[in-house]
Amino acid sequence: VDIFPEHCPENPSEYLKEITVEHLLTMSCGHSTDPTHESWEVKDRSWIRFFMEHPVTHKPGTLFCYNSLGTYVLSAIVQKRTGEKLVDYLYPRLFRPLGINNVSWIESHEGINTGGWGLFLKTEDLAKMGLMLLQKGQFNGCQVVPAEWIESASSAQVPCVPAGMNSDDADKLRKVAKTSDWLQGYGYQMWRSRYNSFRADGANGQYILVIPEKNAVVVTTAHIQDMQAELNLIWKHIYPAL
């Protein structure tokens, strides 16, 4: 609300006014449903406004609900604060130090990188990202990202449930917590996984899986609906061989 007063509803709820950047990072804004897919049909107003108009049913920080539109708002915050689109801001600070040169990121109708989706990278570039994460922000001897940030981002900050569900549905899933990679906790835009690992993932099975105990990174690109099945194959066949 403080960052985008121009997009704020006329009478914002107290819960809406409480949302912080950390709530956006941890997908714990207090929404009980994800407005992302609905936003794609919105062309007559800002997606930031659409995000703010979505009902905040719980106190921020108390309910996990996977929400890519919240990540879009993070991208918008970077653009407003720096004057650069997210992809341009990251080029000299992240992509170029990792030797990643060809990056494409979809933009919204209002000229903001989508943030939570639409980033196109080669598989080997995803592996570079994973290696940097494994090495706590270092790559080729340079500290690209502060180690403290990697530690916080990859640690469980909030309890979580699979995308498409919210924490109100969590109790029925706890009995399978030991076999689910979506019940291990959520950090800053990254999931915790089994075997004390963590990951960045994209729709339909795009994974950067970081396994510190094995000093390993596993990267996949795929088109699969059952993303847990893909991870199960990694744990069954690749993990024991590491």
Each language-model region and where it sits:
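Active-site helix/loop module of the DD-peptidase/beta-lactamase fold
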Residues: 1-29, 53, 82-117, 121
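Solvent-exposed loop and edge beta-strand segments that line ligand/cofactor-binding
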Residues: 12-15, 59-66, 113-120, 199-206
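Structural recognition of the beta-strand scaffold that forms the well-ordered cores
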Residues: 23-26, 65, 102-105, 120, ...
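Alpha-helical scaffold elements that line and support the substrate/ligand-binding pocket
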Residues: 24, 64-94, 126-133, 215-218
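Structural helix-adjacent loops and short alpha-helical linkers that scaffold large soluble proteins
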Residues: 33-36, 79-91, 137-145
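Flexible, glycine-rich surface segments
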Residues: 96, 101-150, 154
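Active-site Gly/Thr loop motif
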Residues: 100-103, 154-217
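Short, gly/Ser/Thr-rich active-site loops of penicillin-recognizing serine hydrolases
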Residues: 228-242
